[in-house]
Amino acid sequence: MQASELLQRIRSNRAPVIIDPRSEVEFKRGHIPGAINAPVRKILLNMAQLPKDRNLEMVIACMHGQRAVMAKWLLALYGYRNTALLEGYLEGWQKADLPWEKAAS
């Protein structure tokens, strides 16, 4: 999914579930508003807080793509079929100066 489409859908309250597979520390430093932190290792161990509905549309994004690709593959193994990667990943999202949320310290 392109960043511009995701942003438009976030703003119109039609956003897919946004999965951020980075570590909790990285996630707290900043993420797409509304994203769910589901580190790859937690997905692998089936311990991530994922939606129960495996048909929900999901967009997966990490900083450069490696963990997003792994997360997408693991989610497919667990039966999540409606998943997409964010084009340009979080690096592209930040370069485009799109909304970015940080955890409260």
Predicted regions mapped to residue ranges:
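Rhodanese-like catalytic fold shared by cysteine-dependent sulfurtransferases
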Residues: M1-V17, E24-E57, M63-S105
